[in-house]
Amino acid sequence: IDAEGMQIDKLDQLIIEHRPKLIYTIPTFGNPSGATLSLERRQRLLELAMRYQVLIVEDDPYGDLYFDAPPPPSLLALSAQIPGSRDFLAHCGSLSKVLSPGLRIGWLIAPPALLAKAVMCKQFSDAHTSTFAQATAAHYLAAGHMPAALAKVRKVYAQRAQVMMQALREELGAAVAFTAPQGGL
């Protein structure tokens, strides 16, 4: 990982060498690095997925938590421009990071066969997500509260990031190097 996120040239070689079944990534404000995959690298990642027929699992819990400028489009959004790439992409999202950690509501957009298996696994693990939590989230979203909530949480996380970076500089100085996050937790 460098300043533009996952190094796709190196990934290409690793895929050839190891032939993975899937590649898991947090391309936007990745944890713990804070790196965001550039637009060019996102496109190349989708192209690699098609070339090697390997599933990309895009975990996108932080995509809406940018501090200033929005990040590049998600792999899911880009897949509309790269025919065939959706067949090799699973996109995971969550309300937990933006609304409430206890809410535990997320989603998966994936190829139909994978989605069917994921639904079965979910049912085996806990039967279903809390109906109350789902209804609460649906009501909140339908009422149009999300933009204000996002603005508030973005401001809080940006302030926390500034405090953390200042503390790292003051306490550790040149002994530590880090990427100044542009979003996320």
What is the meaning of each model-derived region?
Residues V54, L89, V176:
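Short, conserved active-site loop motifs that form the nucleotide-linked donor/cofactor pocket
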Residues A35-T36, D68, L78, M120-C121:
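Residue-level signal for well-ordered alpha-helical positions
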Residues A80-K155, Q162:
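Conserved core segment of the aminotransferase class I/II
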Residues T28-N31, Y62-G63, S96-V98, P112-L115, ...:
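Short, solvent-exposed loop/turn segments at secondary-structure junctions
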Residues E4-F67:
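Active-site phosphate-binding strand-loop segment of PLP-dependent enzymes
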Residues A138, K155-M165, A175-L185:
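Conserved glycine-rich beta-strand-loop-beta hairpin in the small C-terminal domain of fold type I
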